[in-house]
Amino acid sequence: MKLWDILATCLLLLSSVSTRPLFHKLQPSKRAVVRSESPALDPIIDSQPETSNPKQASMEEQYDLTGLYPEQFEDVMDFIEATLGRLRRSSDVEPQMKRDRVRQKAAANTEKSGGRGRGERKRSRGRARSRDDRVKGQGRGCLLKEIHLNVTDLDLGYRTKEELIFRYCSGPCHDAETNYDKILNNLTHNKKLDKDTPSRTCCRPIAFDDDISFLDDSLEYHTLKKHSAKKCACV
């Protein structure tokens, strides 16, 4: 579109030059000759040249105009050639700029896709490690488990249809036993200690869930505290 706009402008300039009146550039000597010679003619003969003088003047003006056109045409043609040269250079530069922009976009997309790929690989490795940790945790003994129950199933004397998730600690603590626990177990087994000796290390909660409140069948509110385990350990 830029090329056609500039060409249209050049054509308008060319047409304006071709139709522009150039009477102010006419040579005054020819008009002076016509005026100086006309009074010397005979009155009888003078009537006819008066009718032919406008034609003769117009032919002279036309002759002068055609003499002036080549210089103006040369200026306009020089302007058009210079404009076309600039357009050719700009048309050669624009495809190169477009190719550079395409390369830059492709490189940016490659970097983004590479970054996403690295992030996905890191996340997959993290998920794999978490699965391994869960598998290893299952073999360590003391674990946090959960079960879905009704509040009435807790046998705390409440009659309600409310439900909750009960979490509890379960599993052996052989790996967590110290020499103290081993000695205590051996002495108890050999009956060298009384039966009221504290029991061995067991899996118990070391943190509890938040308190819960519920409405029983008698429309009374109750609150349970330290009812469910949140974190377990061998103690």
Swiss-Prot record:
Molecular function as annotated in GO: glial cell-derived neurotrophic factor receptor binding; growth factor activity; MAP kinase kinase kinase activity; protein homodimerization activity; receptor tyrosine kinase binding
Glycosites: N150, N186
Keyword check for Transmembrane: no
Entry's Gene Ontology cellular component terms: extracellular region; extracellular space
Signal sequence extent: 1-19
Region of interest called Disordered, as start-end residue ranges on this chain: 34-60, 91-137
Cell location: Secreted
Keyword GTP-binding attached: no
Keywords (A to Z) from UniProt: Cleavage on pair of basic residues, Disulfide bond, Glycoprotein, Growth factor, Secreted, Signal
Described function: Neurotrophic factor that enhances survival and morphological differentiation of dopaminergic neurons and increases their high-affinity dopamine uptake. Acts by binding to its coreceptor, GFRA1, leading to autophosphorylation and activation of the RET receptor.
Quaternary structure, from the entry: Homodimer; disulfide-linked. Interacts with GFRA1 coreceptor and RET: forms a 2:2:2 ternary complex composed of GDNF ligand, GFRA1 and RET receptor.
Family: Belongs to the TGF-beta family. GDNF subfamily.
Protein name per the record: Glial cell line-derived neurotrophic factor
Organism: Danio rerio (Zebrafish)
